[in-house]
Amino acid sequence: MGLLDAGITKHNVLITSVDNVLNWARLSSLWPMGFGLACCAIEMMATNASNYDLERFGIFPRSSPRQSDLMLVAGTVSMKMAERVVRLYEQMPEPRYVLSMGSCSNCGGPYWEHGYHVLKGVDRIIPVDVYVPGCPPRPESLIGGLMKVQELIRMEQIGISRADALKKLAEKSVDPRVVIEEERKALRA
């Protein structure tokens, strides 16, 4: 009975160490490709400026989908543009992540009800990992979303699907409204 005969289990020391090294390398060198379509693209460009210095997080923007592992969809996705979004997503190598930035790409924005030409959320055509709300969201919000993507990468394991990792991340997230309400109750008591 050698090491290979024993089989690979979820809690194997070797696999756990490999998971940690791979995840550290992925989250420390995140290469996003911006797909700016409207107002949110201006905030995305501001985030890439020297004021916020994304390179300190290991985030270096790329212009080719074949070199990127994160797609930032920012702005209103029209029906004509949807085909191009899917094509770019399919050209990205695995593992690939998608961050939807702003109300328009999250749910259609102000055009959701009467805009027949607007897609009611980019998640209808490609899987989205992290949503950043706002119209348009501030650069700080985008940085928070990028850090959520890094948390998601940190939690990935060999043999565990991304859907399970997303569930774990959602369980760890704290709703600020709950924290404020708990603090109010503590002050009243």
UniProtKB/Swiss-Prot annotation:
Enzyme class at the top of the EC tree: translocase
Give the enzyme's EC designation: 7.1.1.-
Keyword Iron-sulfur listed? The answer is: yes
Q: Which GO terms describe its molecular function?
A: 4 iron, 4 sulfur cluster binding; iron ion binding; NADH dehydrogenase (ubiquinone) activity; NADH:ubiquinone reductase (non-electrogenic) activity; quinone binding
InterPro entries according to UniProt? NADH_UbQ_OxRdtase-like_20kDa, NADH_UQ_OxRdtase_20Kd_su
Question: What does the cofactor section's free text say about binding?
Answer: Binds 1 [4Fe-4S] cluster.
What do the Gene Ontology cellular component annotations say?
A: plasma membrane; respiratory chain complex I
Q: Which reaction does it catalyse?
A: a quinone + NADH + 5 H(+)(in) = a quinol + NAD(+) + 4 H(+)(out)
Q: Kindly list the residue ranges recorded as spanning the membrane.
A: none
Location(s), subcellular: Cell inner membrane
Task: Give one GO biological process term.
Answer: electron transport coupled proton transport
Which parts of the sequence bind [4Fe-4S] cluster?
Answer: C39, C40, C104, C135
User: Under which name does UniProt file this protein?
Assistant: NADH-quinone oxidoreductase subunit B
What is the scientific name of the source organism?
A: Chlorobium phaeobacteroides (strain DSM 266 / SMG 266 / 2430)
- Gene expressing this chain: nuoB
